[in-house]
Amino acid sequence: MVLHEVINEFLELDGDDYDVVKISEVKGSRIIKYISSYFVGTLKKVEYIPEKLHKHAGFIIRNMMNIVMGNVGIDVGYCNKLFNNIARWFLGFQKFIEKHNLPEKYFKEYYYAAFSGLFILIFGKIKNFKLYDTIVRLWIIVDNIFGFGIDFGEKGLIWKKGVYDFFVGGAFENREKRLEFLEKSGGGPIIECFRNIERIGLSEKKKDGLYLRFYKLFKFAYEGGGGGEGGSESGGEFEILKNSCLKTKKGLDIFFYAIDYKKKKEDAYKIFHLSLIVQLLDDLMDIRKDKLEGKTTIFTGGVEENTRNAVRLFQLIQNSRIIRDNSFQILYECLMFLIIDLNEEFFEPEFVGKIRRECPVMDLKYYNMREIDSVVESEIMKKILCIYLK
């Protein structure tokens, strides 16, 4: 019962009864649920919309999103700016994939990673959109090179050595060495990301801090082929959860460079709390993959245990001091329900049924991860994004 022990560090709650799951109501819940019944279906029909109607279609899509965001209490003006940038990121990353001949599956990874990173908006708004985009790109490429280098073959080994030399060789520590390394290095997606960081306009002090945090993250996650400080899979369930949370926390530390926020010592508790929630949602999302690969997380147990742990995670989201009474709480809840609906066979049927019946802002029959996945194919998504930007 590792999760039960960890959550009791924060809450005095008993998470064994899934009847405690009371999904948040928000203003306009009925309208949002109505929209959710049509939203994905509308997107799937985008490819049949004549070009002369693209501008009108873009207005409809944007308006649907604004209604949802406005009703959950999020600044619609900022969301418009944010989604405009997200659309440009996705289109830019598609070109990045083509330029470096990367696997198409990375587009979907980028899509989910970019949205997952938005959890940090609880602390402040994104102020450097180019940096945020570069951080997501760099993380995806490095994660795949170190974790699944087979996708790249010999090129992957060269890129992996480039990252190793850059950080372990100390090129990141001062500007002269850094620029010299970039000049001598060949191409490749990682070097392009490093070059983007150099061009973004950060002060040298901020660049040094950013590179240092990347170094700490990569070292923690991958030293010793994943079995080093951050890859401890032999220390039992608690150690796995602890190390996963620390890895997530180190990742969030990097995203702080892209948002309007000055880190304070007293926020350390909040940051760890958010890291725990983000990591647990990630484990929840990866149940099927983790089981196939023989990994152990708190969601790779039996159906009853998974259900209890899902209820505890829900309680953690609803009672977290950092998320409670925040506009983003309903979005966290919705993400969790989408994931549980997708992985229904790993939970008690009564629990899944309760979520499907009672969620006030989503009709999970129509708006679910299977349908969303069917839309997040690069060509369809590319057209949707172009229409949205019109």
What are these model-derived regions, one by one?
Residues 307-368:
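C-terminal structured domain segments
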Residues 1-38:
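Intrinsically disordered, low-structural-confidence terminal and linker regions
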Residues 15, 40-42, 54-62, 295, ...:
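Charge-biased, low-complexity intrinsically disordered regions
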